[in-house]
Amino acid sequence: MRIIGIETSCDETGIAIYDDEKGLLSHKLYSQVKLHADYGGVVPELASRDHVKKTIPLIKAAMAEANVTPQDLDGVAFTAGPGLVGALLVGATIGRSLAYAWDVPAVPVHHMEGHLLAPMLEENPPPFPFVALLVSGGHTMLVEVKNIGEYRILGESIDDAAGEAFDKTAKLMGLDYPGGPLLAKLAEKGTPGRFKFPRPMTDRPGLDMSFSGLKTFTANTIAANGDDEQTRADIAYAFQEAVCDTLVIKCKRALEETGLKRVVIAGGVSANKQLRADLEKLAKKIGGEVYYPRTEFCTDNGAMIAYAGMQRLKNGDVCELGLQARPRWPIDQLTSIQK
């Protein structure tokens, strides 16, 4: 079976074609970073308009690279949510239209399920069950994963997502958009131990998280110490260390609560080198394993949507004609899009 995946939930247009026997046949991605850079963040209307321009050409390019025709496809998967409603509607409209024209099922995919399953595209995929740490610009959550579609949310951020905190803190420090990766790079030049940031909500039981207070702490630290280059690097180091420590502490608790030994980390922040290293240390300490996707599949992409869509298609999770998008869609309520 073959399926095409369409990702348009935010500011990346991603298209991929996946074969359940041969694996990934093609993968195309267009990033809108330059489009939004002058605004310091994603402008939803601009994002939607750009998806309209880029999606069809990328679909043609992906099909040409994979050497497939519409007759070779068994389904069209698209991100149905969560995300920016206008951006989602572009992908949903195109996806459902193509499914109708090609007489194949339309398969709505949950964006975070796509991230969660992205490591399955690797040569050494994680076996079920495992604990997933999903860390992106819009979501940060810990999920117990028993199998595909069997998810239990263990904890999540009650305010800013980790990726959002990285980007907002980077903006406070005068870094360009998107600031998260730039802050991480600046942190590599930082001096360990000069500044000590709090580890929010780690002094109490539970698996929920909070990162918004770290922005205020960063602003106060800058105000008290200046913003010369080395000080900025030291602050970046302390901020990143606080976020990573918090995530690792919560991961450890989640593993203890579930009795599991395997951790999957996915989403844009899963590309962070420090977070990966810290989770590797945790896994080694407890005799566990940590899995994550290759860097290009950490951020939004069509490959993860195509893979997740294939699993949904095999399970019969397809939708009738009619347009639906879910800007807000809990990952433990996946069946609601078909109803």
Curated annotation (Swiss-Prot):
Pfam families: TsaD. It comes from the Bacteria. Its main location: cytoplasm. It is found in: Cytoplasm. GO terms for cellular component: cytoplasm. InterPro entries: ATPase_NBD, Gcp-like_dom, KAE1/TsaD, Peptidase_M22_CS, TsaD. It catalyses: L-threonylcarbamoyladenylate + adenosine(37) in tRNA = N(6)-L-threonylcarbamoyladenosine(37) in tRNA + AMP + H(+). Binds 1 Fe(2+) ion per subunit. Its cofactor is Fe(2+). Fe cation binds at residues 111, 115, 300. Belongs to the KAE1 / TsaD family. HAMAP family: TsaD. This is tRNA N6-adenosine threonylcarbamoyltransferase. It comes from Vibrio cholerae serotype O1 (strain ATCC 39541 / Classical Ogawa 395 / O395).
